[in-house]
Amino acid sequence: MKRALPFAWMGLALACGGTSPAGPGTASTPQGATFPSTDGVRLSYALDLPPGSGPFPAIVFGHGSGRTTKDEAMVVKSAMTRLGFAVLRYDKRGVGASTGSYEGVGPINGARVLGELADDMAAGVAFLRTRPEIDGHRIGLMGISQAGWVIPLAAERAPDVRYMILVSGPTVPVGLEIYYSDLAEGTATGYDELSARLREYQGPLGFDPRPHLEGLNVPGLWFLGAQDRSIPTRETITILSELRTTGHAYRWHLFDPYGHFIPQDEYVSEAAAFAAGFR
């Protein structure tokens, strides 16, 4: 994950209860509003509410890689509020109007940086639970790409989140994902070759999400592209399959024609049905 990811995929419409208004959501955010995270960091946010009196189910939106801001979640905000969801979106720490320092993620610093990003996402959940407009018992986490590492950590830190929805999110260690991405951009073209080369990798692994996924009791749904050249989809599914055998409520949908960017129309209905089970 070497670049910021576009958010055209973000037309996700999760219908899991609450009012289903036809009109756009309304902002509930004072100018310059922030909420606190760890280490004195304050995160600039927007909280978008559907029409109606609430309390509303809510989603905390997690970032992909890069210097992303709350404005890059506008599409998901519009879709979610139309279906009765509140959406909390915020500038990544060290980006936009949020304080703190921005860092990219690598094998050496990954555990620390991803932990900080998870602290921020969990702080968003805690913030929502202080708001009278929000049903604190119906909060879910959603994200793309890098959020595949962040969301399981955030779910550990935020008890009672109802579900996780991850689009193109890896379950492999950071070092392995970076190595795969480098190979895919280089001379290794076939997925059999890529998988074989991954098995030979002897470099630093860095942060590994698997132990955290093993310890969670939060249902999760992954949408994955078979042609993804950013994350190793085969290995991600292998890990999810193994975790399912130990009783974890993890499932996935593999889209054969697509890579890292899966058109929203391909998965929105399934995502909505999944979230509808957590009223």
Sequence positions of predicted segments:
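N-terminal cap/lid segment of alpha/beta-hydrolase-fold proteins
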Residues: G23-G52
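Short alpha-helix in the alpha/beta-hydrolase fold that links the catalytic acid
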Residues: V218, P232-E242
